[in-house]
Amino acid sequence: MESFFVFFTAAALPVVVAAAVIAGLCITAAWLARPRRVAEVFRRQGIDGPPPSSFLAGNLPEMKARVAAAASAAAPTADGEETASAGGGGGGRDFEKDGFDDYCTRIFPYFHKWRKAYGETYLYWLRRRPALYVTDPELIGEIGRCVSLDMGKPKYLQKGQEPLFGGGVLKANGACWARQRKVIAPEFYMARVRAMVQLMVDAAQPLIASWESRIDAAGGAAAAEVVVDGDLRSFSFDVISRACFGSDYSRGREIFLRLRELSGLMSETSVIFSIPSLRHLPTGKNRRIWRLTGEIRSLIMELVRERRCAARAAREHGGKAAPPSPPERDFLGSIIENSGGQPRPDDFVVDNCKNIYFAGHETSAVTATWCLMLLAAHPEWQDRARAEVLEVCGGDGAAAPAAPDFDMVSRMRTVGMVVQETLRLFPPSSFVVRETFRDMQLGRLLAPKGTYLFVPVSTMHHDVAAWGPTARLFDPSRFRDGVAAACKHPQASFMPFGLGARTCLGQNLALVEVKTLVAVVLARFEFTLSPEYRHSPAFRLIIEPEFGLRLRIRRAGGQDATSQVDTSTAPVHSSHN
């Protein structure tokens, strides 16, 4: 029997090896043939694109080369970078007259070149994966209307940005995303945001105090020059920290400051251009990322354990006198409360706290920065918006206006149009990106499984065909009758918070927060662009000013140091500049 087994094994081994070799060759052949097969599927639908410049890297080498060439062409000269002349700046571009350059052609030069060569929709390659660049409004509409869980966020983004987002709602897919969205989305409904306006006004007090002290240091009547980015980020930090962590907001700030540092590290290299395997090597940068990731998790879990202990104590104290205070009902409390039914409850809490930071902070801070830049460059709109704020809040320049509440902010129509135009010219997200997890029919287009769909948000927002000849000018009046009347194909031409079912959860919070901050600032200050302001939008996960925003700030006409917006007091934080 043993000899038969030995004989059978010896006879079967070559067959097994041959079958394994044949199977391996078939798999390899299919892998090698897939790009050509996919390209042919798109070619039959009239879609072509640049040929891959590398067998393994696709079009990435050409993309890198064009970015390097654009950066070299934009390097500072002896005369310095472009400066702004509108609204009090010095010697450079007049934004009121000339409008804004299409910064996308500088940041993403390869897309601009390929669009001119191959049309509205074309195919390119990210390593071995097909990517479809889409500016056809009809196809964008189909992508937006798709509610299938077979389309979602690309897996390369999940892996490449895992330290920032983990498996939270912003990057999750399928049933996991649907389950998390059901828990997180209600926290950003307008009914919840309505109750946060006083919180926003309170969070603005350190900013007001900081700018007031700088004006006083400049002599009171003169303008103080301020790099405002740090103050605006500090304001947004306070808002989301108070909303997410309640009375623990000071500890929440420590978490979010580390997230900001982590975000800066992650944005140093584009997730598209980075080599995936390198993120596992113990380089200096990776060790800093791992350290910050661990610290953030530890800080969040420390709060979670305290909240869970408080909830347990409250339950066990039922019926006795003087029960302990119930656990707080803030974002963190809600996430903890709903974490029990999740497969990995601790990861659910940690990842979604990080996701709330990006949904509720980054968008607001950067949008507020661009909004103040645009108002500084267009003083007539600044005056109109200020007049509306004073009319709604009851101030007359000499008397202190009331602090805005939700109803007041909702009535500020001009301020709302200014914010919408800001989001059009400088949308926080540069792209809406999706991946098909099976072959999908999107209108007339068949997208094979594994296709990336790239919708360039900024390009659509600046499209002359949709917005008319003033597309690159700042003109909030275009939104006088709403988005639908402002442009052609509104679903495809205006999507500052994303597209379809995956629209940013924090959009209500961001819009109300920016409007509230603008109202508080306009009621107190007048501002112009500094001659030192260098206009250079840069891509760092989101589009933000590369060199910061320098403003010259003075008190609004007729006010003195004692005439302030009537708000509740808040602790003064030191400036971040």
UniProtKB/Swiss-Prot annotation:
Segments traversing the membrane: 4-24
Chief location bin: endoplasmic reticulum
GO cellular component, one term: endoplasmic reticulum membrane
Residues binding heme: C504
The protein's Enzyme Commission number: 1.14.-.-
GO molecular function, one term: oxidoreductase activity, acting on paired donors, with incorporation or reduction of molecular oxygen
Gene Ontology terms describing biological process: gibberellin catabolic process
Membrane topology: Single-pass type III membrane protein
Gene3D superfamilies linked to this entry: Cytochrome P450
Reported tissue expression: Expressed in rapidly elongating or dividing tissues, including the shoot apical meristem, the intercalary meristem and elongating zones of internodes, and panicle but not in young seedlings, roots and leaves. During the heading stage, the highest expression is detected in the flowering spikelets, anthers, the divisional zone and the node of the uppermost internode.
Keyword Disulfide bond part of the UniProt annotation: no
Lumenal side: 1-3
Location in or out of the cell: Endoplasmic reticulum membrane
Keyword Transmembrane: yes
Cofactor(s) annotated in UniProt: heme
Keywords: Endoplasmic reticulum, Heme, Iron, Membrane, Metal-binding, Monooxygenase, Oxidoreductase, Signal-anchor, Transmembrane, Transmembrane helix
Cytoplasmic side of membrane: 25-577
Source species, domain of life: Eukaryota
Chain segments carrying region Disordered: 315-343
Protein role: Catalyzes the 16alpha,17-epoxidation on non-13-hydroxylated gibberellins (GAs), including GA4, GA9, and GA12. No activity with GA1, GA20, GA53 or ent-kaurenoic acid. Reduces the biological activity of GAs.
Family, similarity comment: Belongs to the cytochrome P450 family.
Additional information: Overexpression of CYP714D1 causes severe dwarfism and sterility.
Protein name, as recorded: Cytochrome P450 714D1
Taxonomic source organism: Oryza sativa subsp. japonica (Rice)
Gene: CYP714D1
